[in-house]
Amino acid sequence: MRLILGLETSCDETAAALVTHDGDIRSNVVASQAVLHARFGGVVPEVASRRHLELVAPVIREALAEARASLDDVELVAVTRGPGLIGALLVGLSAAKALAWGRGLPLAAVDHLHGHVASLYLEPAPLEPPFLCLLATGGHTLLLDVRARSGYRSVGTTIDDAAGEAFDKGARLLGLGYPGGAALDRLAADGDPEAFDFPVARLDGLDFSFSGVKTALLYAVRALDAGELERRRADLAASYQRAIVRALVERTRAAAEQLGHERIAVVGGVAANSELRASLAEAVLAPLELCTDNAAMIASAARYLTPVAPPGFLELDAYAAA
Amino acid sequence: MRRGLVLAFDTATPIAASALVRDGEVLGERASRAASVLADADDLLRGAGLAPADLDALVVGTGPGSFTGIRIGLAAARGLALALGIPAAGVSTLAALAAASPGGLPVIDAQRREVFTLVDGEPVARSPAELDFEPGTILIGDGAVRYRPELEAAGAEIPPDRDVVHVPRARFHVLLAGDFGDADLVEPIYVRAPDAEKAIA
Ligand SMILES: [Zn+2]
């Protein structure tokens, strides 16, 4: 076997995967820390970094075992270099460098966002550029002009909260805990999306803004007494979700039209949102298990990069911001 | 101490240390930054005409010190141990400092007006004013250097700022290493809980 070992530790998932050069996923192990961070109401960088250190070697061993492979089958190590939580990134980067150096293997340092896009290039239904990609996660909301598998060009971004962050914050306002995006989606299914009018700021160009809609939800929640809030929680969730999804869909379609793209793809955790999937029915969506952070997408992106031979990669540093 | 070719490194403090030791003989030592510790190791091996695959065991500094620094070292040790199928041992950064200066009390800068030191052999974080030592005790480490005036006023003997005893040296990690085993079982010594844990505790 000739395999790429991917490693991802940029936020609160410790992940390792084995992928072939053809984009076949042989294993894709994700150890989520969501439960660990729930009691803090968000990801705590120091807590995440400590957990990554505990999990980094076990997830690699598990990925090898699931693929029925050994390190002798690995011929390239791919690791997320940024953007993300710097302390968390450094755990994965340090382990990956040591592993590659110890085995005399080349290393590919992968941009996390490129990784999300490269989730679309995996088997069984790999997508061929060009396409317009909406990348929506808890940390990013980007419109990407994708012309080749080796990269992307950003044409729009959020000027404040990310879409996934807006869902999580909305969920918290509705008492759904953290992370609450999925719970908000479920609650919204029982509500009337037209019950409340939550305005989403319309910016010039292709940028997004979600802080206003979050504030509108806050005021709506405050205006209701406890009993009424309980009765109308589903309506609030549905209306809030509709507002965010509508903004995402409008901007994404506008970007595709401006750039002359016939195809739209959606990647990132927000691609799991049922309303987004229904509203942007023409879009190509990555499989759900590849939407959230994982290492198969990192190994996939590495297929289109030039790896660095040892010891050239030993001085590589991580970066927090894109 | 283990026989064979041993690579040791400690990235817990601002000056990262590494050493290559064969059957107790120090083949080379380096001092740089945490991010460069594997590049240093590569240099040391090349200088001796050797390669990573020749390593028989690892020794890694476990702190206390910078949280991120400790993790860079331990993650590297775990990745390397996995890559080579070799055992690892952990040695506390305080113990390695103390070994270089018998009778000395190790004092590592812990930021926030505190230092890491040993009390009854246990690592703790203390304000410099709370340190308990006999007058004439030799204090070593970057914490001793940083708080020199007040510690000397309390009776400490502190070697000159540039003395090598203030910096961990990885040859001592090899000397102190006892139990070699699975690198995953080598635990970091953070001493402090994450701030968020304290906030909800
Ligand atoms: Zn992500």
Where are these regions (language model features)?
Chain A
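Conserved phosphate-binding catalytic cores of ATP/NTP-utilizing and phosphoryl-transfer enzymes
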Residues: 1-2, 110-132
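Glycine-rich beta-strand-to-loop/alpha-helix junction loops that act as flexible
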Residues: 79-82, 99, 137, 264-272
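Conserved phosphate-binding/catalytic loops in two-lobed NTP-binding clefts
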Residues: 109-110, 264, 280-298
